[in-house]
Design a protein with these regions (language model features):
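PAPS-dependent sulfotransferase catalytic domain
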Residues: 34, 41-84, 90-199, 215-216
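PAPS-dependent sulfotransferase catalytic core
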Residues: 46-47, 63-70, 195-268
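N-terminal pre-catalytic "stem/leader" segment of glycosyltransferase-like enzymes
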Residues: 7-37, 43-44
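Viral RNA-dependent RNA polymerase
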Residues: 4, 14-15, 86, 103
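Membrane-proximal basic amphipathic "stem/tether" segments
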Residues: 1, 262-278
C-alpha cells in the first residue's frame, strides 16, 4: 500500500510558530492548512485528525495549537511531527509582550497584559491561569496538553520520549538550523521542500540574544520572582536541555552544513528583500 505523508506542526504558543506557519504555507501552498478554526472546541482527538486528512485529500502539511502528541498511527497515513522548543522564561516574556499588543479588548489576558507590568502579569497568571505559566511545554508533549494540575517528573519523562520521536525537532534559539534540518531529513518525502522565511511577530527593539533577553527579564522581575519562575518551570528547563542535546545529535549528521547555512540564509535574505521592495 502506498502511504500518504502529512507533516504536522505542533504550534506551541510563542515558540516561533507563526514564522513556521508562514514558511509552511509558502512551501506547500494549497496543500497546507492551519486548522485552529476547523477545530475550535478543544484538543483534537486522533480520530478527528484522521477524518480531517481523509476528507481533505490535497493536504500535505498541517499546523495547529490543538493537536495531541503523539500523532495517530494509521495504515494509510504517515504523520511526520514537527515541534520547536524554547527557553520557558523567554517564552513567557515573549507571550506577555505579544499579548499586550493585541487589539481584542474583550480578552481578559489582553486587558491584564495591558494594565500590568511583566512581573505583575506573571503573578496574575500564577493565581488565575497556572496552565499558561507552569511547565507549559512539558504539558503539551507529556500530557497531551491537558492541565488539571502541574506536570510531574512522570510527565517530563513522557515528554522527553515524545520529543525524541519527533520527525523534526527544533530549538527556537537555533531556528535557522532547525529548518535546515527539516529540509534535509524530510527530503526523501518532500524533495523540493524550501522552508526559507521572513520573520513574523518579532517585538520591536527586542534584545538579540537569549542571554540579553533573560537579563532584561531578571531586571524587570527581580531576583526573587525570577528564581520562582525558574522553579515553576524546572521541568520545561530539563526538557529544553534534553531537546538541545537531541537536536545537536541529529544536526551533526547533516553534511556540508556551513554551505547549507550560507545558502539558507541567502534564500531568507532574498525573501526579505522582495518583501521590502513590494
Amino acid at each position: 500500500m502506498r502511504h500518504r505523508y502529512i507533516l504536522i506542526h505542533y504550534h506551541i504558543f510563542k515558540n516561533a510558530g507563526t514564522t513556521i506557519l508562514w514558511a509552511l504555507e509558502r512551501a506547500f501552498g494549497n496543500a497546507f492548512r492551519s486548522v485552529d478554526e476547523d477545530f475550535d472546541h478543544g484538543r483534537v482527538p486522533k480520530s478527528e485528525l484522521v477524518r480531517f486528512v481523509k476528507q481533505n485529500r490535497q493536504v500535505a502539511a498541517l499546523s495547529g495549537h490543538l493537536f495531541c502528541l503523539p500523532a495517530p498511527k494509521h495504515e494509510r497515513y504517515r504523520f511526520l511531527e514537527l515541534c520547536f522548543l524554547r527557553h520557558p522564561l523567554d517564552r513567557l516574556q515573549s507571550a506577555y509582550h505579544y499579548t499586550r499588543r493585541l487589539e481584542n479588548t474583550d480578552d481578559i489576558n489582553v486587558a491584564q497584559a495591558r494594565a500590568l507590568s511583566l512581573p505583575d502579569y506573571l503573578l496574575w497568571l500564577r493565581e488565575n491561569q497556572p496552565y499558561n505559566l507552569i511547565n507549559v511545554q512539558t504539558c503539551v508533549l507529556g500530557n497531551r496538553g491537558r492541565y488539571f494540575f502541574p506536570p510531574s517528573p512522570y510527565h517530563l519523562e513522557r515528554a522527553i520520549a515524545c520529543m525524541r520521536e519527533l520527525a523534526v525537532l527544533g530549538i527556537v534559539e537555533r531556528f535557522d538550523d532547525g529548518l535546515i534540518a527539516a529540509e534535509f531529513y524530510l527530503k526523501s518525502v518532500f524533495p523540493d521542500l524550501d522552508l526559507s522565511y521572513v520573520s513574523q511577530q518579532v517585538r520591536p527593539g527586542r534584545p538579540v540574544t537569549l542571554a540579553e533577553r533573560l537579563d532584561e527579564m531578571r531586571r524587570q522581575c527581580g531576583d526573587d520572582l525570577y528564581r520562582k519562575l525558574e522553579a515553576w518551570n524546572d521541568l520545561d528547563l530539563q526538557l529544553l536541555e534534553a531537546g538541545e542535546a537531541e537536536f545537536a545529535r541529529r544536526f551533526q549528521f547533516i553534511p556540508h552544513i556551513e554551505q547549507r547555512q550560507h545558502e539558507f540564509r541567502a534564500r531568507c535574505d532574498a525573501l526579505r528583500d522582495q518583501r521590502m521592495a513590494a
